[in-house]
């Protein structure tokens, strides 16, 4: 599944079983994107400030758990849940003060535990996690658009915004 954006640019997107992410360390001088394929790469990106801002960190962490699910080699649901829990703990260590990080990780944890406890198959759990990560990102984008719509009236037309 590819998560499409209508914008010409993006800060993060899911494409071909990987997370593509703008490297914020180089902004505004240049746009550089990373392609992350493992939950460890996601954790390192959060730690190295590739991604900044609590909501964005939460979104990225959610996709990190999707990568953990897709990369797990576990053959049964209990081992699969343990793999996801290990990834969740690793991601939680990346930014201990980022509230959205823990909120997103908890939200994803509820998804996999609910599905696994109902003995649903792994493929369905993976798809459910991906859908939840996409929903977390969509909610954040909607919130940002609303902030912009409400804030535009506060900026005089003659102002220059950096």
Task: List the model feature ranges, each with a label.
Residues 50-162:
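N-terminal active-site beta-alpha-beta segment that forms phosphate/nucleotide-binding
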Residues 1-47:
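Positively charged, low-complexity intrinsically disordered leader regions
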């Amino acid at each position: 599944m590819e998560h499409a954006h209508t914008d010409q640019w993006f800060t993060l997107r899911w494409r071909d079983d990987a997370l593509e992410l703008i490297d914020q360390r180089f902004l505004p001088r240049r746009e550089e994107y990373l392609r992350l394929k493992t939950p460890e790469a996601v954790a390192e990106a959060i730690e190295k400030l590739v991604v900044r801002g609590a909501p964005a960190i939460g979104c990225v962490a959610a996709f990190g758990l999707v990568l953990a699910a897709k990369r797990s080699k576990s053959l049964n649901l209990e081992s699969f849940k343990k793999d996801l829990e290990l990834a969740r703990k690793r991601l939680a260590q990346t930014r201990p003060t980022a509230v959205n990080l823990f909120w997103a990780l908890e939200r994803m944890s509820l998804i996999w535990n609910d599905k696994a406890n109902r003995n649903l198959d792994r493929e369905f759990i993976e798809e459910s996690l991906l859908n939840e990560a996409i929903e977390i990102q969509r909610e954040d984008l909607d919130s940002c658009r609303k902030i912009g719509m409400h804030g535009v009236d506060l900026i005089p037309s003659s102002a220059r915004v950096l």
